[in-house]
């Protein structure tokens, strides 16, 4: 199986998952604890950047993450399609 085929399979598995318990189980099976923490931090970063007017340095300090991670997240939000999608999916 190629990486592309495996990626498509992963997407199908995730899309077919309809319960939070099943999704949690899948993520725990395929991600290390460190990878899971990185994903969680990204969600926290996007949520903070989308819902506050805090500077990147303030967000980094508040969340206890590096300014590099904040900058990467802010760069992704420059794409309006990504920004609109994330605003609908993760904003509180």
Curated annotation (Swiss-Prot):
Origin superkingdom: Bacteria
Main location: cytoplasm
Subcellular location per the Swiss-Prot or TrEMBL entry: Cytoplasm
An example Gene Ontology biological process: negative regulation of DNA-templated transcription
Swiss-Prot/TrEMBL keywords: Cytoplasm, DNA-binding, Repressor, Transcription, Transcription regulation
Role according to the record: This protein is an aporepressor. When complexed with L-tryptophan it binds the operator region of the trp operon and prevents the initiation of transcription.
Full protein name: Trp operon repressor homolog
Organism for this UniProt entry: Xylella fastidiosa (strain Temecula1 / ATCC 700964)
């Amino acid at each position: 199986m190629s990486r592309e085929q495996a990626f498509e399979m992963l997407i199908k598995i995730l899309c077919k998952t309809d319960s939070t318990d099943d999704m949690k189980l899948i993520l725990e099976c395929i991600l290390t604890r460190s990878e899971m923490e990185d994903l969680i931090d990204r969600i926290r970063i996007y949520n903070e950047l989308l819902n506050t007017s805090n500077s990147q340095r303030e967000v980094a300090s508040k969340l206890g993450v590096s300014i590099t991670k904040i900058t990467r997240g802010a760069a992704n939000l420059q794409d309006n399609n990504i920004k609109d999608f994330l605003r609908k999916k993760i904003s509180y």
